[in-house]
Amino acid sequence: MVMEKPSPLLVGREFVRQYYTLLNQAPDMLHRFYGKNSSYVHGGLDSNGKPADAVYGQKEIHRKVMSQNFTNCHTKIRHVDAHATLNDGVVVQVMGLLSNNNQALRRFMQTFVLAPEGSVANKFYVHNDIFRYQDEVFGGFVTEPQEESEEEVEEPEERQQTPEVVPDDSGTFYDQAVVSNDMEEHLEEPVAEPEPDPEPEPEQEPVSEIQEEKPEPVLEETAPEDAQKSSSPAPADIAQTVQEDLRTFSWASVTSKNLPPSGAVPVTGIPPHVVKVPASQPRPESKPESQIPPQRPQRDQRVREQRINIPPQRGPRPIREAGEQGDIEPRRMVRHPDSHQLFIGNLPHEVDKSELKDFFQSYGNVVELRINSGGKLPNFGFVVFDDSEPVQKVLSNRPIMFRGEVRLNVEEKKTRAAREGDRRDNRLRGPGGPRGGLGGGMRGPPRGGMVQKPGFGVGRGLAPRQ
């Protein structure tokens, strides 16, 4: 069999899936993605109010990660770009939303430079990691502009899951609520990008434990939060102490019961990250038709289309989900109870935000007011009070006349459960009746050539876990 080299896009997306899964499940292990010369930046300001500086080296990165107090961290990935870079490395850019400790989702952008580890082919570690929240860069806070955007942020997995995107070995490994299926959907069509001539990095740190699986070498995944650094020799001093730590704790043993017996997961420094890249994804279109029964592809395609056909107009929504429309103003990223909010429709197109706020201030203290002027008239918006009493007061005084002549369409904001119920009803009433489940289990790798599966992580730890 011919073993193909995984494309940068495939490497990047597999790394992203593994990285953010670990961020949710075991953030204290994230430092294993990095090496002695890795750099890491995770937004925020220092004590002087200036952008925080990068930290270098596995130990300092571990301290920095622990200082972030990542707890129950959930990530919605909206887009992943990956390109080949110098010395057979891969640069990965991630855009999405992140919620830490059950707080509101915040839009972020993160860039990784994955460098070859050196001891095994297709094994990488994170050489540079740069993370920024967009609200810190552009000022103010960005909230989900309206109900529709909340739906998209919270239910991405409802839209994209297809049988071919994630094979059994990876599908059983991570929680789709942690990493949005947007990323998985793109995995069906990775584009192999030309990689520059290899310029070997002699100083990469060898990891003996990773060499145990030579047929499918492991990509050394390097990390999630932020890093800025150019060339990096391999981390060597920490390797010995880390290997001892790795022998005492193995994620592979924890997750092995969930993995299919046919796909062995390499035992690396960061076994939890080492998940196989689906062999089907690099070039699904290149498989010879002669190897596939003549009628089955069409049937499978129809099934896939039915499963993916969750209203087509929802596809582009994630783009505007966090207030990306030019007319939507930046707003504070605070999640208020639905009982404190009102939907305001039929707003005059020239209405001023301060004028509207003063109008509703007569009913109670207005803590936030949003106007959506995306081009469709009349405009609409939301008013947020500090208590539910003003909301009921406004509703009981309907009809509400603005400027004495404009009747506003004032409604209580629907709860999330009500919105979800409406969506389910709409789907059940759609063409063809209720949809069948997506079930059937994930399909395994297709017939044809195989692709070497990347692995991530240097497998270096600090002291044994406490």
From Swiss-Prot:
<dbReference type="InterPro" id="IPR039539">
    <property type="entry name" value="Ras_GTPase_bind_prot"/>
</dbReference>
<dbReference type="GO" id="GO:0032481">
    <property type="term" value="P:positive regulation of type I interferon production"/>
</dbReference>
<feature type="compositionally biased region" description="Basic and acidic residues">
    <location>
        <begin position="297"/>
        <end position="307"/>
    </location>
</feature>
<feature type="cross-link" description="Glycyl lysine isopeptide (Lys-Gly) (interchain with G-Cter in ubiquitin)">
    <location>
        <position position="64"/>
    </location>
</feature>
<dbReference type="GO" id="GO:0051607">
    <property type="term" value="P:defense response to virus"/>
</dbReference>
<keyword id="KW-0347">Helicase</keyword>
<keyword id="KW-0488">Methylation</keyword>
<feature type="cross-link" description="Glycyl lysine isopeptide (Lys-Gly) (interchain with G-Cter in ubiquitin)">
    <location>
        <position position="357"/>
    </location>
</feature>
<dbReference type="GO" id="GO:0003677">
    <property type="term" value="F:DNA binding"/>
</dbReference>
<feature type="modified residue" description="Phosphoserine">
    <location>
        <position position="250"/>
    </location>
</feature>
<keyword id="KW-0399">Innate immunity</keyword>
<feature type="region of interest" description="Disordered">
    <location>
        <begin position="184"/>
        <end position="243"/>
    </location>
</feature>
<dbReference type="GO" id="GO:0003678">
    <property type="term" value="F:DNA helicase activity"/>
</dbReference>
<comment type="subunit">
    <text>(Microbial infection) Interacts with Semliki forest virus non-structural protein 3 (via C-terminus); this interaction inhibits the formation of stress granules on viral mRNAs and the nsp3-G3BP1 complexes bind viral RNAs and probably orchestrate the assembly of viral replication complexes.</text>
</comment>
<keyword id="KW-0547">Nucleotide-binding</keyword>
<keyword id="KW-1017">Isopeptide bond</keyword>
<dbReference type="GO" id="GO:0004519">
    <property type="term" value="F:endonuclease activity"/>
</dbReference>
<feature type="cross-link" description="Glycyl lysine isopeptide (Lys-Gly) (interchain with G-Cter in ubiquitin)">
    <location>
        <position position="353"/>
    </location>
</feature>
<feature type="region of interest" description="Disordered">
    <location>
        <begin position="413"/>
        <end position="466"/>
    </location>
</feature>
<keyword id="KW-0694">RNA-binding</keyword>
<dbReference type="InterPro" id="IPR000504">
    <property type="entry name" value="RRM_dom"/>
</dbReference>
<keyword id="KW-0963">Cytoplasm</keyword>
<keyword id="KW-0391">Immunity</keyword>
<keyword id="KW-0378">Hydrolase</keyword>
<dbReference type="GO" id="GO:0010494">
    <property type="term" value="C:cytoplasmic stress granule"/>
</dbReference>
<dbReference type="GO" id="GO:0043204">
    <property type="term" value="C:perikaryon"/>
</dbReference>
<feature type="cross-link" description="Glycyl lysine isopeptide (Lys-Gly) (interchain with G-Cter in ubiquitin)">
    <location>
        <position position="376"/>
    </location>
</feature>
<feature type="modified residue" description="Omega-N-methylarginine">
    <location>
        <position position="447"/>
    </location>
</feature>
<dbReference type="GO" id="GO:0005737">
    <property type="term" value="C:cytoplasm"/>
</dbReference>
<dbReference type="GO" id="GO:0003723">
    <property type="term" value="F:RNA binding"/>
</dbReference>
<feature type="modified residue" description="N6-acetyllysine; alternate">
    <location>
        <position position="376"/>
    </location>
</feature>
<dbReference type="GO" id="GO:0033677">
    <property type="term" value="F:DNA/RNA helicase activity"/>
</dbReference>
<feature type="modified residue" description="Asymmetric dimethylarginine">
    <location>
        <position position="429"/>
    </location>
</feature>
<dbReference type="GO" id="GO:0003724">
    <property type="term" value="F:RNA helicase activity"/>
</dbReference>
<feature type="modified residue" description="Phosphoserine">
    <location>
        <position position="232"/>
    </location>
</feature>
<dbReference type="GO" id="GO:0005829">
    <property type="term" value="C:cytosol"/>
</dbReference>
<feature type="region of interest" description="RG-rich region">
    <location>
        <begin position="410"/>
        <end position="466"/>
    </location>
</feature>
<feature type="modified residue" description="Dimethylated arginine; alternate">
    <location>
        <position position="435"/>
    </location>
</feature>
<feature type="region of interest" description="Disordered">
    <location>
        <begin position="144"/>
        <end position="172"/>
    </location>
</feature>
<feature type="modified residue" description="Omega-N-methylarginine; alternate">
    <location>
        <position position="435"/>
    </location>
</feature>
<keyword id="KW-0597">Phosphoprotein</keyword>
<dbReference type="InterPro" id="IPR032710">
    <property type="entry name" value="NTF2-like_dom_sf"/>
</dbReference>
